[in-house]
Amino acid sequence: MMAAGPRTSLLLAFALLCLPWTQMVGAFPAMSLSGLFANAVLRAQHLHQLAADTFKEFERTYIPEGQRYSIQNTQVAFCFSETIPAPTGKNEAQQKSDLELLRISLLLIQSWLGPLQFLSRVFSNSLVFGTSDRVYEKLKDLEEGILALMRELEDGTPRAGQILKQTYDKFDTNMRSDDALLKNYGLLSCFRKDLHKTETYLRVMKCRRFGEASCAF
């Protein structure tokens, strides 16, 4: 469960998170680039927190503590997004251009749209995962934000984005099966890792462009 501090911050940002990108970009065409980056970072941070909380609760509920380390070192925990030539941390991300980081972020986001569309069905009977029903919509919203940033940086004429031919498998709804539990555990682990990458890339770009004093992360 999230601590009071992060929960309060998320509540304060609720109005901003609920505002669609189409409204922000269309109704407020004079929005600055810094504003677009700030909104994208906020959305990525929120999604990463949801992914991390869901993973931790799933792990606590279904995976015995003595098995967690060994599972994380098996093929179950392999994320196919690791085959994308993506930076693995802040230092590597700083070597990439903003457009490169945006394109990689878009690939990561799009690889999850299919699986997460049905996430709520997997955890429909569990109060622990009450936020899962809106994860897909939030992910689509972040995708729109990244596309908006790409349009701004490419002078309104973005090149055709690369689409991953392979995406993650769907979550398994048979929660009584050990194989299904391991599969879902691995997927949630990968989702958390990919959202962490996306948040890191967006924060690097925002800090690099606008030189904020609070760029340490």
From Swiss-Prot:
It comes from the Eukaryota. Zn(2+) binds at residues 46, 199. GO terms for biological process: animal organ development; growth hormone receptor signaling pathway; insulin secretion; positive regulation of growth; positive regulation of receptor signaling pathway via JAK-STAT; response to nutrient levels. It is found in: Secreted. Residues 1-27 form the signal peptide. Its main location: secreted. Disulfide bonds join 79-190, 207-215. Pfam families: Hormone_1 (PF00103). SUPFAM superfamilies: 4-helical cytokines. The keyword Cell cycle does not apply. Keywords: Disulfide bond, Hormone, Metal-binding, Phosphoprotein, Secreted, Signal, Zinc. One of its GO terms (cellular component) is extracellular space. One of its GO terms (molecular function) is growth hormone receptor binding. The modification Phosphoserine is found at residue 132. PANTHER family: SOMATOTROPIN, SOMATOTROPIN,PROLACTIN. Belongs to the somatotropin/prolactin family. Plays an important role in growth control. Its major role in stimulating body growth is to stimulate the liver and other tissues to secrete IGF1. It stimulates both the differentiation and proliferation of myoblasts. It also stimulates amino acid uptake and protein synthesis in muscle and other tissues. This is Somatotropin.
